[in-house]
Swiss-Prot record:
Active-site residue list: 85
Localisation: Secreted
Keyword DNA repair: no
Thermal effects: Optimum temperature is 37-40 degrees Celsius.
This protein's GO CC annotations: extracellular region; membrane
EC number: 3.2.1.17, 4.2.2.n1
Protein name: Bifunctional muramidase/lytic transglycosylase CwlQ
Gene3D superfamilies, per database record: 1.10.530.10
Domain of life where this protein originates: Bacteria
Effect of residue 85 to Q: Lacks both muramidase and transglycosylase activities
Entry remark concerning the domains of this protein: The N-terminal domain is important for secretion and protein stability.
Keyword line: Cell wall biogenesis/degradation, Hydrolase, Lyase, Secreted
Alphabetized Pfam families for the sequence: SLT
Length: 181
């Protein structure tokens, strides 16, 4: 990834296959290059963020699209949850026993009809179904749904909002910052 703080406009332009021009009689080309540098850096940053929430695995991407379509949940939200939960590691198992891409607890997985939480298709299907249930329960409030996904709906209800658990508060902030970017 290009580091715009240490990169000149001409080198940024060159990196994206664009031409760089200089002019001794006018600052307008320099200003245009600086504008382009900012635009290219912003574009690079946005592309970098988008790439961070791609699995790079066609079968996982396909499972995400299928679940998003089936449950009416934004694909970008599902990807942001997976990125936070497992870093797109289908074999991830937490210390608490949560498993797979969307880190389903065994009892939750079972209640969602997921027989193998380490199977990417089943995990994404079950995790998205659960995320949709939380979105419905909290009237589409993404932050509340994410808090419930992480800490359980009982805790969200008990505290009347995002629980005062540092882990849950950080979880919601991290996912929403990627999702709303």
């Amino acid at each position: 990834m290009l580091n715009s703080a240490n990169t000149t406009a001409p080198s940024l332009l060159s990196a994206y296959g664009l031409n760089s021009y200089t002019s001794s009689n006018s600052g307008s080309v320099t200003k245009a290059a600086e504008s382009t540098e900012t635009a290219v850096a912003d574009s690079a940053s946005n592309k970098h963020e988008a790439n961070q929430i791609r699995s790079g695995d066609f079968s996982i991407d396909s499972a995400i699209k299928k679940a998003a379509d089936k449950y009416g949940v934004d694909e970008k939200l599902i990807r942001a949850v997976i990125k936070q939960e497992s870093g797109f590691n289908a074999k991830a198992v937490s210390g608490a026993g949560a498993m797979g891409l969307m880190q389903l607890m065994p009892s939750t997985a079972s209640s969602l009809g997921v027989s193998n939480p380490l199977d990417p298709q089943q995990n994404v299907e079950g995790g998205t179904k659960y995320l949709k249930q939380m979105l419905d329960k909290y009237d589409g409030n993404v932050s509340m749904a994410l808090a419930a996904y992480n800490a359980g709906p009982g805790n969200v209800d008990r505290y009347g909002g995002i629980p005062p658990f540092q882990e849950t508060q950080n979880y919601v902030k991290k996912i929403t910052s990627v999702y709303y970017a």
